[in-house]
């Protein structure tokens, strides 16, 4: 069963989403998911990271990604844009 709270990374392009998935492969478990409708930006593809992997996500993001991504905390289906520092 999936948790009610998780993190979602949305991307400006499909290329960026796929590149991030590859980059995170050995750093943090991610699942490809459609971007939530409540998030009105991006290419439509996002990466989901479970709440228990927050530390791994923060470490992976500290290594840098191309520009054009946004981070959201999803609680009960509602997205809140956050910064990496807020993890």
Language-model features: where?
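Short glycine-/aliphatic-rich beta-strand segments at the starts of folded cytosolic domains
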Residues: 1-10
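Amphipathic, hydrophobic secondary-structure cores in small proteins
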Residues: 8, 14, 22-63
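NTP/phosphate- and nucleic-acid-binding module
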Residues: 19
């Amino acid at each position: 069963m999936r948790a009610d709270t998780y993190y979602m990374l949305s991307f400006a392009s499909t290329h960026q989403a796929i590149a991030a998935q590859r980059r995170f492969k050995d750093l943090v478990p991610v699942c490809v998911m459609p971007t939530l409708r409540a998030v009105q930006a991006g290419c439509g593809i996002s990466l989901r990271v479970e709440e228990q992997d927050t530390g791994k996500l923060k470490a992976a993001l500290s290594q840098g990604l191309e520009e054009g991504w946004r981070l959201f905390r999803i609680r009960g289906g509602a997205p809140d844009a956050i910064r990496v520092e807020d993890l």
